[in-house]
Amino acid sequence: MWAKTTAFALILAAAAAAQDDEAKKKDEEAKAKIADFKKELKGAKNEKDISHAIEGLGELQHPRVLAELKGYLGRSAEEAVAAAEQIGKYKKDKDAADMLLGAAGARKDKDGIVKCLRYAGDTEFKGIVTKLTAYFRNKDTDIAKESVDSCAKVKSKDAIEPLLGLWKELDGIKEEKADKGGGLGVGGLGGGITGTGGVGASMQEEQLKRKRDLTPAVQSALNKITGEDFKDLRAANDWWRKNKGTFKDLE
């Protein structure tokens, strides 16, 4: 018995030593990769060259590399997008997902925000759903849509009710025909807008575009998260009322 215990202990010790050696090896690889990256930066003549160097750095996934990439999320749009794309490859990684959501909140340029949201979704880390759904009400339809699309990639049941709520708001935007006075009415997000043109008509078109762009995205996201095929909002709500207590995230 003692001999078996000793042998087992030796096996465990050997396995631990092997893991430690592998970790040290990867750490050295990361240091070398970062050193090569910095050398390449010295020869960079423009943002395109820098972005290319960032892509090369991202070929190796390691905490040291991730920390290096983080520093570029606050740079120019092109550099930030290049870094965000590489960070998005860190699947199920909380730090990577949080970095991208933090960058999305800090940036002022639309493309940078959209891409950070997109690559945050690529991490598939479920802990970011609450932050993603906060973008549903963003006035910019493209930003709102990207947050919906990212929820579809994360596939967390925590996104279902916010998505249903958004669908309800969008469903409330009515595509009404012109009334006798030539005006058009719109409900939902900005309801009660009427008029013969000008600002009212412009706001109406904006809301209708939002509805047309976001509704298919919301429907698709709900289908991917639940594995169902909802044809309309009523069907989705009915299903959720019946399954809310037992539904678990799909693998």
Predicted regions and their residues:
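Bacterial N-terminal signal peptides that target proteins for export
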Residues: 1-7
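Hydrophobic h-region of N-terminal signal peptides that target proteins for export
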Residues: 9-18
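N-terminal leader/linker segments that initiate helical-solenoid repeat arrays
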Residues: 18-63, 78, 198
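Amphipathic alpha-helical scaffolding segments comprising HEAT/armadillo-like alpha-solenoid repeats
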Residues: 27-40, 62-74, 81, 92-106, ...
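Positions within the helices of HEAT/ARM-like alpha-solenoid repeats
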Residues: 45-50, 76-81, 108-113, 128, ...
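Conserved hydrophobic register position within alpha-solenoid helical repeats
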Residues: 53, 83, 113-116, 147, ...
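Structural signature of alpha-helical solenoid repeat scaffolds
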Residues: 58, 88-89, 118-121, 152, ...
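Extended alpha-helical scaffolding segments
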Residues: 150-235, 239-246
